[in-house]
Amino acid sequence: MRNKRISIKKVIFYICLLGLIILLVMPILWAMLLSLKTNNEIVNSPLSLPQTIRFENYQRAIDTIDFSKMYFNTILLVVISTFFSILFTFMSSFAIARMVFRNHKASETLYLFLLIGIGIPIYVLLFPVYRIDSLMGILGTRLGLILPYVAVNISFNTLLFTGFLRDIPGELEEAAIIDGCNLFKLCTKVVIPVMKPTFVTIIIFNAVYIYNEFPFASTFIQDNALNTVSLMTSMFKGQYSMDYSGIIAASLMIMLPELVFYVILQKYIISGMTAGAVKG
């Protein structure tokens, strides 16, 4: 009777799991079907199978978009912004979690202040950051995007870094200091290797966010030569029409690299997100 009850629970669990998988995969499969249709088919019968498979939609997307330039611009922003965001937030998180403050409330206040950004919508920041970039003379440049990208990731990075750093046994650091490690060696030789899953998780989340980011890019980029992949939809807009099949085909091509990147490193995401969540 017990085995029968367990088997029923398993069946229900797997049915729910299958339903969730279908729910998550269906939009991608639907987009793949739409990318093989004509614009008329997409507008008039979006749920039907394509009457004729049209791979030329992908060729048109390649001809319309300068993928090499857009990928270069995007990857450059991703690498620089992610590097400095991680550098600054790791140092601040290490100070909050591991260094002794005379006033404990001061460190907690600083920590909470850094976490405030999690609850601030990106669109609220557009106008203030636009004004700051304009006053600094960096509006329309890569630096004008790198600075806000670094800033908006501070709260999330601090949350993960501080949570993991507080879970590292103090004896590990004490032993390293007794062996002659200074603060720099303590971080690079002891702490960072232990935090590898957390670092990989933060790199992935920061990189994927910047790769897909649209509000800042669409507002601050004023030169087509600096366009990122998130702005490719503008290439398919006419004055009175829109190339839906071209947009969908290009979107799938742009999504593929980050999907592969995520699948390869997914085990680090799970271990990194759970790091610090369980004591002992």
Where are these regions (language model features)?
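A hydrophobic, multi-pass inner-membrane permease signature
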Residues: 1-280
